[in-house]
Amino acid sequence: MVMTDPIADFLTRIRNANTVYHEKVEAPASKVKKAIANILKDEGFVKDCEFIDDGKQGIIRIYLKYGPNKERVITGLKRISKPGLRVYARKDQVPKVLGGLGIAIISTSKGIMTDKKARKEGLGGEVICYVW
């Protein structure tokens, strides 16, 4: 079966593993997925992420993060721009997630970055997802 939206599949794997308190989750790798995983790590939503070379496209392994009493660090994860309906934001329309408590991951002309960094650099682009 052909996968029409690999990024949505990646986010769903993370969401499902987070819901059932898994320690780690694996997904097929791509440049975009690596960039998203690194942003999640840098923003403190996941413990760590690593790339495993399997001779094909590779695998991304993400170690999920939980609080001391098993509270989820990732409360929500939502795909915004989909293959059937792309969502773009100009530099003055970059969204804030939960008043700045969450992040929007945006694909800009200078790479994939958070909404804060895009606003700081004065860039717009495709809104990939929201994480809170």
Curated annotation (Swiss-Prot):
Coiled-coil regions listed in the entry: none
| Family of this protein | Belongs to the universal ribosomal protein uS8 family.
| Entries under InterPro entries matching the protein | Ribosomal_uS8 (IPR000630), Ribosomal_uS8_CS (IPR047863), Ribosomal_uS8_sf (IPR035987)
Keyword rRNA-binding assigned to the entry: answer is yes
Q: Which organism is it from?
A: Pelotomaculum thermopropionicum (strain DSM 13744 / JCM 10971 / SI)
Quaternary structure, per UniProt, is: Part of the 30S ribosomal subunit. Contacts proteins S5 and S12.
Which residues are the signal sequence here? Answer: none
According to the lineage, what is the superkingdom?
Bacteria
Which residue ranges run through the membrane? none
Pfam families for the chain: Ribosomal_S8
What is the protein name for this chain?
A: Small ribosomal subunit protein uS8
Keyword Transmembrane helix in annotation: no
> What PROSITE patterns does the record tag this protein with?
RIBOSOMAL_S8 (PS00053)
Instruction: Check the record and name the PANTHER family matching this protein.
Output: 40S RIBOSOMAL PROTEIN S15A
- Tell me which Gene Ontology terms the entry assigns under biological process: translation
Q: What does this protein do?
A: One of the primary rRNA binding proteins, it binds directly to 16S rRNA central domain where it helps coordinate assembly of the platform of the 30S subunit.
